[in-house]
């Protein structure tokens, strides 16, 4: 899906919903302030958590606000991978085979983020194994 130029990089101005989710997203009027909080929370998480757990939690912090009309998951994964790279880890690629698990673990993370963190941990490991296989190591 391609986002139109008027909405690219701009906080959403309308209410959005995630189909299948029982957790409502914040209203558009709350997004700017919540995003300031997300930036601070990510900084705090990075100081306290293991880098892989911090990356997973940074992803969740962003995606729970869902600040854009489109591309929130992609941006959340970019943030997650930035945290990983800055901490000396390789990126975590979520296999298309695990997409349903990825979505359900995000939904479950509203109450307990352990399943999502485990998914990201295993994705970091699997991505590293894929790199090694490609290099015949």
Q: Where are each of the predicted segments found?
A:
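FIC/Doc superfamily catalytic core
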Residues: 1-70, 74-137
